[in-house]
Amino acid sequence: MGDGAEAAGATAASRFGTICVFCGSNAGRRRVFGDAALDLGHELVRRGVDLVYGGGSIGLMGLIARTVLDGGRRVVGVIPRALMAVEISGESVGEVIVVQDMHERKAEMARRSKAFIALPGGYGTMEELLEMITWCQLGIHDKPVGLLNVDGYYDPLLALFDKGEAEGFINSDCRQIFVSAPTASELLTKMEQYTRLHQEVAPATSWEISELGYGRTPGADQS
């Protein structure tokens, strides 16, 4: 961990050694989004958490990655080869794993992480968030999922989830799969306290997803 301000503000170590953060390759039009990415990065460092992210060096991705790396934590970026010229500007941040497609990217990020957080972002960020929620519902993983609702950015999405529950498309227990909060500190505290309440559709070992380690030879690396 880094010294100085980070060390002075240290808190108890998180039970999550590594957290995957989904976020935009754009910074957004308002400073509040960039500030939130920086704050989350500092909070991960304070709690002794390493970062897995989408591998870009621009937008919110670049901000949080540089913050965590500068704080002395490990940063691993996972990026499809086709997006390297688009999402990496100048030097990459931390370690970079190049994959073939978006599915492999998400699976590799999930395999390497103990929890997931979504910062504001566009279609890609929302799709990644929803896939991790769906995988949890199906029983593919049981890792906490957090939504950092910066300045109400995700209020319409949360309202849609509430509508889905009210109309009978989302089970009430599945509505509790993820937690949300307006600040990084509050969100991570909620995630530390998260307990699964929903009934999984099928156990993780019944899913043949080699990228996540299911169906692999026993003893294979699943760090």
Curated annotation (Swiss-Prot):
Listed GO CC annotations: cytosol; nucleus
GO biological-process terms attached to the record: cytokinin biosynthetic process
Family: Belongs to the LOG family.
Keyword 4Fe-4S appears in the UniProt entry: no
Keywords: Cytokinin biosynthesis, Hydrolase
Keyword Hydrolase attached: yes
Enzyme Commission number: 3.2.2.n1
Pfam families for this protein: Lysine_decarbox
InterPro entries: LOG, LOG_fam
Expression (tissue specificity): Expressed in roots, leaves, stems, tiller buds, shoot apex, immature inflorescences and flowers.
Residues given in the record as substrate binding sites: E87, R105, K106, G122, Y123, G124, T125, M126, E127, E128, T134
Protein's job: Cytokinin-activating enzyme working in the direct activation pathway. Phosphoribohydrolase that converts inactive cytokinin nucleotides to the biologically active free-base forms.
Catalyzed reaction equations: N(6)-(dimethylallyl)adenosine 5'-phosphate + H2O = N(6)-dimethylallyladenine + D-ribose 5-phosphate; 9-ribosyl-trans-zeatin 5'-phosphate + H2O = trans-zeatin + D-ribose 5-phosphate
GO molecular function: cytokinin riboside 5'-monophosphate phosphoribohydrolase activity
Name by which UniProt lists this protein: Probable cytokinin riboside 5'-monophosphate phosphoribohydrolase LOGL7
Species, as recorded: Oryza sativa subsp. japonica
